[in-house]
Amino acid sequence: MFDDQQTNEPVTCSFCGKTQDQVKKIIAGPDVYICNECVDLCKEIIDEELASENAPTEITDVPTPAEIVDYLNQYVIGQEEAKKTLSVAVYNHYKRINKMAETKADEDEPELQKSNISLIGPTGSGKTFLAQSLAKILNVPFAIADATTLTEAGYVGEDVENILLKLLQNADYNVEAAERGIIYIDEIDKIAKKSENVSITRDVSGEGVQQALLKILEGTIANVPPQGGRKHPQQEFIQINTTNILFIVGGAFDGIETIVKNRLGDKTIGFGTNASTTVEEDKSLMQQVIPEDLLNFGLIPEFIGRLPILSALEKLTEEDLVHILTEPKNALVKQYKTLLGLDGVELKFTPQALHAIANQAISRNTGARGLRSIIENVMRDIMFEIPSRNDVAKVTVNKKTVIEGAEPEVELIDEQAS
């Protein structure tokens, strides 16, 4: 403790500035004082850092592809082919990491190369959500990046290393954990070359970004600025090995159907059939995309080569969207039923109302992503009024409520009792 008789000046904590009257205790050191509150804070910081350092960095029990699909089925409706492709790819990726850790010194073992993934599908088909769900079941750090914000070094915009910074931040700056994480890069189709003609000006956000991404996709020791950006040139860099980071890229690739159709147009499908009428008989055009089509779309060969696994997601139908509203563990209808249930009110959506919500999402071309904003708009007045009433037993949302904004059907407690 300290001797306050040696000076008439009030003693304050050297860290937070609080006086002895404002805290329980102040501990004295050589020309320095610390209060009990700052001691507690220091202990919390040290405990957090130790917990981060001791966090497991290996996935000891990698779920099988079947187990991964079973998990995805709880949250993702449809897209069966994509789920199967992703589950196998992710299983092999983390099995490869564990194998490499076991056989580092064995030069006779064959080298297992990383297989990053491309997801092609319309807006709102579930590309981002699939990637998030994979990271969740594997309990690995996850980060999302937008390809449209990236530029090559020397231009205004985000460096590709900032993608790794997001992953590192989500791993609480545990480098080893980040090096086994998953990064999802959205809007990857937006960095395709716009044409085959060589432009006089530099392609800042197209081919240049593809070139900048090549090394981290393949595996390199990247220097990551802990403060991000280019505003702190004197900062020390954190080195991250990207060899074991799984990269998943996604994009809508609007217009790629035409490229696929042109490729298939010269080929006869089946015996004595017209190719132009049978292109979509067995699979949708999106399901028939191959690397050659991505090349024609504007991705460079080296970039395509770093993404050997290709999976296409189909456009969600009205029936799919209705299932998304009602079936998954985190279904929006289930969430709203629970919220109103906390006020003692039962909530019901008629089948016609659910189809009307799904139809609006399709007409807006937003897919599953647009469902929340539509249902939020439908439920706003209901969620505003119900907490102020104690006579409501049940609320039924019908088609008119969704389309015209009409009042929902309300059943009162007295009516239900009678």
Swiss-Prot record:
NCBIfam families: clpX, PRK05342.1. It comes from the Bacteria. Belongs to the ClpX chaperone family. This is ATP-dependent Clp protease ATP-binding subunit ClpX. GO terms for molecular function: ATP binding; ATP hydrolysis activity; ATP-dependent protein folding chaperone; protein dimerization activity; unfolded protein binding; zinc ion binding. ATP binds at residues 122-129. Keywords: ATP-binding, Chaperone, Metal-binding, Nucleotide-binding, Zinc. It comes from Pediococcus pentosaceus (strain ATCC 25745 / CCUG 21536 / LMG 10740 / 183-1w). The keyword Oxidoreductase does not apply. Residues 1-54 form the ClpX-type ZB domain. Gene3D superfamilies: 1.10.8.60, ClpX chaperone, C4-type zinc finger domain (6.20.220.10), P-loop containing nucleotide triphosphate hydrolases (3.40.50.300). The keyword ATP-binding applies. GO terms for cellular component: HslUV protease complex. Pfam families: AAA_2, ClpB_D2-small, zf-C4_ClpX.
